[in-house]
Amino acid sequence: MFIDGKWIIRDDIDVFDPYTLKNIEKITALDREETKNAIEITEKNKEVMKNLSPSKRYSILMKIAEQISLKKDLFAKTISIDVGKPIKQSKIEVDRTLTAFRLSAFYAKELRGETINSENGLIFTKKEPLGVVGAITPFNFPLNLITHKIGPAIATGNSVILHPSSKAPIAAIYLTKIIEHVLKQMDIPRGVFNLATGNGDIVGDEISKNDKINMVSFTGSVEIGESISKNAKMKKVTLELGGNNPMIVLKDSDIKLAAKSAVKSKFLNAGQVCISVGQVLVEEEVLETFTKYIIDETKNLVLGNPLDTKTDIGPLISPESALRIENLIKESVNEGGELLIGGNRQNSLIFPAVINIDEDNLLSKIETFGPVLPILKVKNSEEAVSIANNSKYGLQAGVFTNDINKAMKIADSLEYGGIMINSSPTFRKDNMPFGGVKKSGLGREGIKYTVEEMCETKTVVIHNI
């Protein structure tokens, strides 16, 4: 809807506040031909970005961060209304966004090749942009996850076409207005950055298939990620997909700390986080104590209006999502799960649920993407690792123990992209490598690592000069 410096305004898709269920915006849905045109414009402007000096790319990113910092409250409120995320969590997302843009700016100046010794001449390498990056982003972090794609893309001199989730596109629209302002201020053609709103099965599909796209960076579900990977053919692809992220609690750990961490992490953004705790595997000697702490902590959570600073858990993104979670809870109980607390639904709200299950229960195998915390009893760390690895996912895992030798042995044994010791799987910093194995994805995010993904290495050899 922002193509070649022009806004295309139509009332094609309704956007709803998931808490009030009121219509808050109408956005444009590009059709396939419009999407192809947007990609073509992005491709025509790739040389503009490539030829910008590192200092100019740095300035673009720092100016974007500066403008966001002046509108922090607006962005936080927008995220809370658009997604249903509690305002205190939305403010953290805005702060992380600023960090990610500033880190991207730093790496714009740090991009460099190397010199290789040779007796036959001079060998050196250059880092060059890929060309056109297609960024496809989800609803749950509608500002920060965009930044993790477009920040490194700009830093490395790529032109960008962004396709945000149509469920929560407003933060992306506000961000695009800032980018428009910065590009105009710096006298850079606006066609280097294009915003393509609409339905994923049209816009996202075309971005993944189109030959003018050099790289697709996607965050979302496994099913769509697999489709993008298939469509992309020889394109470079990074996929940050789902997970059922285990948290192992051993009897020698700080049980109360582990329980607090599990509750805080599981119910962040109503469980709509790809690295949310998927299941807690607890040694049987401390299961009763751990479960008591979990229930006590869960009872203290405040459910309600995302704009209230006291709220800990807001709604899911839609009533349909909440109904899906309600049905998953019922199915889990039918399979023998014991519901200890919560699980009731009111429109898009789900009261945080805690369920005792075994490893054959469906909640041990899937990504719930909702406020449901499954607890499993295990005999020892070996059984915990075995259950954790018996999964198609491999995003992040957490281990609580006071024995560093056990911790390192378990970290070596777990088949996951990231292992958090004495922290939940939900831990993430914007400058650390982030990504999964197995069905949880391809490639790594984290600004430095995304910068590496968005470059090509060119080798130059000089003889006899």
UniProtKB/Swiss-Prot annotation:
<feature type="active site">
    <location>
        <position position="274"/>
    </location>
</feature>
<feature type="active site">
    <location>
        <position position="240"/>
    </location>
</feature>
<feature type="binding site">
    <location>
        <begin position="220"/>
        <end position="225"/>
    </location>
    <ligand>
        <name>NAD(+)</name>
    </ligand>
</feature>
<comment type="function">
    <text>Involved in F420 biosynthesis through the oxidation of lactaldehyde to lactate.</text>
</comment>
<dbReference type="InterPro" id="IPR016163">
    <property type="entry name" value="Ald_DH_C"/>
</dbReference>
<comment type="similarity">
    <text>Belongs to the aldehyde dehydrogenase family.</text>
</comment>
<dbReference type="InterPro" id="IPR053404">
    <property type="entry name" value="Lactaldehyde_DH"/>
</dbReference>
<dbReference type="InterPro" id="IPR016161">
    <property type="entry name" value="Ald_DH/histidinol_DH"/>
</dbReference>
<protein>
    <recommendedName>
        <fullName>Lactaldehyde dehydrogenase</fullName>
        <ecNumber>1.2.1.22</ecNumber>
    </recommendedName>
</protein>
<dbReference type="InterPro" id="IPR016162">
    <property type="entry name" value="Ald_DH_N"/>
</dbReference>
<dbReference type="InterPro" id="IPR029510">
    <property type="entry name" value="Ald_DH_CS_GLU"/>
</dbReference>
<dbReference type="InterPro" id="IPR015590">
    <property type="entry name" value="Aldehyde_DH_dom"/>
</dbReference>
<keyword id="KW-0560">Oxidoreductase</keyword>
<keyword id="KW-0520">NAD</keyword>
<dbReference type="GO" id="GO:0008911">
    <property type="term" value="F:lactaldehyde dehydrogenase (NAD+) activity"/>
</dbReference>
<comment type="subunit">
    <text>Homotetramer.</text>
</comment>
<comment type="pathway">
    <text>Cofactor biosynthesis; coenzyme F420 biosynthesis.</text>
</comment>
<dbReference type="Pfam" id="PF00171">
    <property type="entry name" value="Aldedh"/>
</dbReference>
<dbReference type="InterPro" id="IPR051020">
    <property type="entry name" value="ALDH-related_metabolic_enz"/>
</dbReference>
